[in-house]
From Swiss-Prot:
Family according to the record: Belongs to the RMDN family.
Protein source organism: Bos taurus
Primary location: cytoplasm
Protein name: Regulator of microtubule dynamics protein 1
PANTHER family, A to Z: REGULATOR OF MICROTUBULE DYNAMICS PROTEIN (PTHR16056), REGULATOR OF MICROTUBULE DYNAMICS PROTEIN 1 (PTHR16056:SF16)
Keyword Cytoplasm in annotation: yes
Keyword Repeat recorded: yes
Length: 317
């Protein structure tokens, strides 16, 4: 990160600049030789006062500059230390996330909840949401965490509108809040969610998670119940629309960008093929989801769902 720029050119540099008193014109003789510059007593006394004032002004200017240097250096050191601290916290946060230490991660990041760093804030939004999804979290706590996550994501986006992750987590958190605000709000939010997922993909076309989430948006809209579609048509001139084929395209695209990056992408590939009545490919992707190593609570839930869907195949056959 860039540090503050020091404007040295605005101040005198060194003692020579601070004490640079100029001799009057005519102090040299007609041939360029130096000659004594004799003054009368009263003139000498006047120049003595002027000299003292000039000396005092120069001294104060110099002291002021020295003070400015000390303060500037202190500010720079503090800023550098703060940047280093944030970078260190982000490294710890990423390690805890990869280790599946959901609650420890949340406890770490909430210590910095007043931060103005977008990278820290979107991670805090993600951590709040992950704690909300833990099986031991009560419904009351879950609702609080969901709204808390949205607030952190919103702040992250305000701090950096060019952040792919900030757009992504803002969209995710809006979707979560919709579960508490009714059908009308949920349908209205669908447009906002799509906009932010598309922006995240635009900012980083190699982010498999954003592509996957756009696939979820398409899948969710495609399976929207008839009564929700009717409400959408009444409330909006052009209600949100999509197809399972479109969803499938995003899920495959995410897999191409980063193979096996997420158990839920494997599960949804299987479920989408089921919607399209392709049981062979559905079984292939559901088996991959069932066999995916469980690192998180969500991975375990996905393993269970994939196994149940596969058993449904066996029972029918």
């Amino acid at each position: 990160m860039a540090l503050a720029v020091r404007f040295w050119c605005l101040f005198p540099v060194g003692r020579s600049a601070a004490w640079g008193l100029r001799l009057p014109a005519g102090a040299a003789g007609s041939r360029g030789q130096r000659v004594p510059w004799r003054l009368g007593a009263s003139e000498a006394m006047g120049n003595s006062g002027t000299f003292k004032r000039s000396l005092l002004f120069s001294a104060l200017s110099y002291l002021g500059f020295e003070t400015y240097q000390v303060i500037s250096q202190a500010v720079l050191v503090h800023a550098a230390a703060k940047v280093f601290e944030i970078e260190e916290v982000l490294e710890q946060a990423d390690y805890l996330y990869e280790s599946g230490e959901t609650e420890k991660l949340y406890q770490l990041l909430t210590q910095y909840k007043e931060s103005e760093d977008a990278e820290l804030l979107w991670r805090l939004a993600r951590a709040s949401r992950d704690v909300a999804q833990l099986s031991g979290t009560s419904e009351e706590e879950k609702k609080f965490l969901v709204y808390e996550a949205l607030e952190y994501a919103k702040r992250a986006l305000e701090k950096n509108e060019s952040s792919c992750a900030a757009h992504k987590w803002y969209a995710i958190c809006i979707g979560d809040v919709g579960d508490y605000e009714g059908i009308k709000a949920k349908i209205a939010n669908a447009y906002i969610i799509k906009e932010h997922f598309e922006k995240a993909i635009e900012l980083n076309p190699k982010d498999a998670t954003s592509i996957h989430l756009m696939g979820i948006w398409c899948y969710t809209v495609a399976e929207m119940p008839w009564y929700q579609r009717r409400i959408a048509k009444v409330l909006f001139a052009t209600p949100p629309g999509s197809t399972y084929e479109e969803a499938l395209g995003y899920f495959h695209r995410a897999e191409q960008v980063d193979p096996n990056f997420y158990s839920k992408n494997l599960l949804l590939l299987g479920k989408t093929y089921l919607k399209l009545h392709n049981k062979k490919l559905a079984a292939f992707w559901l088996t991959k989801a069932k066999d995916y190593p469980a690192h998180t609570e969500e991975d375990k839930q996905i393993q269970t769902e994939a196994a149940q869907l596969l058993r449904g195949f066996s029972d029918k056959n």
